[in-house]
C-alpha cells in the first residue's frame, strides 16, 4: 500500500509541476479576451486549477520532509475546529488522546474533511474515540451526502460528483483524495457512510 501511495504521489506531483507552465500561459492570454463574461469564467477555472495543483504540491512536499512525532490528537482537533464557524460544528472529543504520526499532515487531513462538510451542510459533529487497537475520528454532517455507488470514486484525484454534493459549488477535487492518502500513509483506513443526520459520515481509523 505504501509503495502504491508513493508511486501515485510522485506521478501526481509530476503532473502538477508540468501543468503550471500552460496555466501561466493561459493567464497571460486572458488579457486578450474582450468578452468580460468569458474572461471571468476562464479566470475562475484557472484559479480553481491552480488551487488543485498547489494543494497537491504542498501535500507532496510535507509528506516527504515531515518526521513522525507523538502529539495530542485531542488538542489538535479542538484547535482545528476553533478556526471554523462555531455555530456549525459541535464536538465529542475526550482529553489527551495521543497519536504517533505526522502532525501537519493529520491537520491537513482534518482541514480537508471539515472544509468538505462545511461547503454542503449546516450542522457538523466531530467525535474522537480510542479503543484497544485504534483511534477513530468521525465527521457527521447534515448535507446531501454522497450516493453509495460514488463513495469509492471520490477518493480518486480530481474526481468531482455531479448533482449530489453539488457541482454548484467550487471543489478542488483533491480534498478527499489527499485525506485518504494521508490516512493510508499512517497505516489507517477511511470509510464513507450515511450519517445519522442523513448526510455524509466520514470515519477514519488510525492505529497507535
Residue locations for each model-derived region?
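Conserved micro-motifs of the catalytic ATP-binding
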Residues: 63-66, 98-101
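Conserved catalytic submotifs in the C-terminal HATPase_c
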Residues: 90-100, 129-132
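A residue-level detector for a conserved hydrophobic packing site
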Residues: 106-107
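Acidic ATP/Mg2+-coordinating residue in the GHKL
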Residues: 141
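Short conserved segment of the HATPase_c
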Residues: 146-158
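Short alpha-helical Gxxx[C/S/T] motif in the catalytic ATP-binding
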Residues: 175, 179
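Conserved glycine-rich
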Residues: 187-188
